[in-house]
């Protein structure tokens, strides 16, 4: 089972954040991970085996500007992944997460690129701090996903969050 929920809502400033909007983003992401886990883990537990892959975000490790509810929700998913791994391992279920960095998708394209395809200032800043020098593509997640679901390759891997960010988290700025 792979859980993936996401939606970015931007506020003007911290003081402009709408509690209902924050709740919506947090609930969509966190409850969108919790509820499917409850449903599908029940069947996996009855079979005595299974693998859960949650989708967190590099925002869980280092919150980024303009999206505090999203960052908080993804941090909750990372924490929940570790918690669930501890409890589900007793019934043969491994639980891990993947934390994508900056991926150029329809969801964030307008934040990272201009209509003509050039980079926005935010997009330029991100790429200047990404050693691989590009945004991720959904296909960049496949290898990590396949590794985590393969019991032979990762059968003793449980409760971790794997960064897939082109080196963004490793870059020190110098």
Question: Each predicted region: which residue ranges?
Answer:
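Catalytic Tyr-X3-Lys loop
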Residues: 1-2, 8, 15-34, 49, ...
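Active-site loop-to-helix junction immediately N-terminal to the catalytic Tyr of the SDR YXXXK motif
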Residues: 12, 63-71, 83, 111
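Active-site loop immediately N-terminal to the catalytic Tyr-X3-Lys motif
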Residues: 15, 62-68, 90-91, 133, ...
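Active-site helix of classical SDR
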Residues: 37, 73
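Alpha-helical segment proximal to the catalytic Tyr-Lys
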Residues: 42, 86-90
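Residue(s) in the substrate-gating loop at a strand-loop-helix junction
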Residues: 57
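Short, small/polar-rich loop/turn modules that mediate ligand/substrate recognition or access, typified
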Residues: 89, 94, 156-158
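C-terminal substrate-recognition "lid" of short-chain dehydrogenase/reductases
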Residues: 134-164, 169
């Amino acid at each position: 089972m792979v859980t993936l929920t996401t939606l970015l809502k931007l506020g003007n400033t911290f003081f402009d954040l709408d509690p209902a909007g924050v709740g919506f983003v947090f609930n969509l992401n966190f409850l969108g991970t919790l509820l499917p886990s409850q449903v599908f883990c029940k069947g996996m537990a009855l079979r005595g085996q299974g693998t859960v892959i949650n989708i967190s975000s590099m925002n869980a490790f280092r919150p980024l500007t303009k999206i505090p509810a999203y960052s908080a929700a993804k941090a909750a998913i990372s924490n929940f992944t570790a918690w669930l791994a501890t409890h589900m391992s007793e019934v043969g279920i491994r639980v891990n997460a993947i934390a994508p960095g900056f991926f150029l998708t329809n969801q964030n394209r307008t934040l990272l690129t201009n209509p003509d395809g050039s980079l926005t200032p935010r997009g330029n800043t991100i790429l200047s701090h990404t050693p691989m020098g590009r945004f991720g593509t959904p296909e960049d997640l496949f290898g990590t996903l396949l590794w985590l679901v393969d019991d032979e390759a990762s059968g003793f891997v449980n409760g971790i969050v794997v960064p897939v960010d082109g080196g963004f988290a490793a870059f020190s700025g110098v």
